[in-house]
Regions:
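Intrinsically disordered, low-complexity Ser/Thr/Pro/Gly-rich regulatory segments
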Residues: 1-237
Length: 237
């Protein structure tokens, strides 16, 4: 937990506030960017996705949570000094979604020692007696490479969950880069029919067991689609 922002929240109410705010894709981008920029943060560095008004509003929200202190000239001091990226906070958020929205038993940041695949699992959840392994990605697709998809598949092969999901926190398309990478990884694992197929929009699956989706629309809707496709396919063919 020490690499998430959670220890820096002063009360359970602030944790609830953070959970609510993280449902906003814009807020997640903002938090991810200020974690990366830290003392180099300037509102204009966040790019055209953010208006000055939205940046100011989100900065106020993060300051009220006690994570930053705003200074003169638009700079900030990041108070959660041990947190260097958004990845593990996002893992916590996704595990909370699975608990709250889908009544799952969920763990995040799981390490199983001694496994040949490295044994690091972002989120593990039990839903209706079925084990889900969910891999989270907070980098945009252009920064995700074949070795990461291959490592994900190696963990799937080692753990052998009932089904698995790769969730990429982006509104960008999955079809252009990540679908080919995952399909190539499946073929490298000996799956001659390893082509990912479209379920709906930017959600894809392989044999209704491995899923790839993004955050466009929203995370809850896309996870709902993956879960519905898996369970309907399992029970109704």
């Amino acid at each position: 937990m020490d690499r998430t922002v959670l220890p820096y929240l002063s009360s359970p109410a602030n944790r609830e506030t953070l959970y609510g705010l993280l449902h906003s894709y814009a807020f997640r981008l903002f938090l991810r960017d200020i974690l990366a920029l830290r003392d180099r943060y300037q509102p204009e560095r966040l790019g055209p996705f953010f208006s000055p008004e939205s940046v100011d509003g989100m900065a106020r929200q993060v300051e009220r949570l006690g994570l930053i202190r705003r200074k003169a000239g638009g700079t900030i001091r990041f108070l959660a000094e041990a947190v260097t990226d958004f990845g593990e906070t996002f893992e916590w958020f996704v595990a909370e979604i699975l608990r709250r929205q889908f009544a799952a038993d969920a763990l995040w940041g799981v390490t199983i020692p001694g496994l040949p695949c490295g044994g690091d699992f972002d989120v593990l959840a039990l839903l209706s007696g079925k084990l889900l392994y969910l891999e989270t990605k907070t980098s945009p697709p252009k920064h995700i490479e074949q070795k990461e998809m291959s490592a994900f598949l190696a963990r799937v092969k080692t753990l052998s969950p009932d089904f698995a999901i790769v969730l990429v926190d982006t509104h960008l398309r999955m079809k252009d880069k990540l679908v080919p990478l995952l399909s190539e990884g499946l073929r490298a694992e000996g799956m001659s029919d390893g082509e990912m197929t479209r379920v709906e929009k930017e959600t894809f699956s392989w044999e209704r067991r491995i899923y790839l989706t993004n955050a466009k629309r929203d995370i809850v809707s896309n996870l709902t689609l993956c879960l519905r496709t898996y369970f309907v396919g399992r029970f109704f063919g």
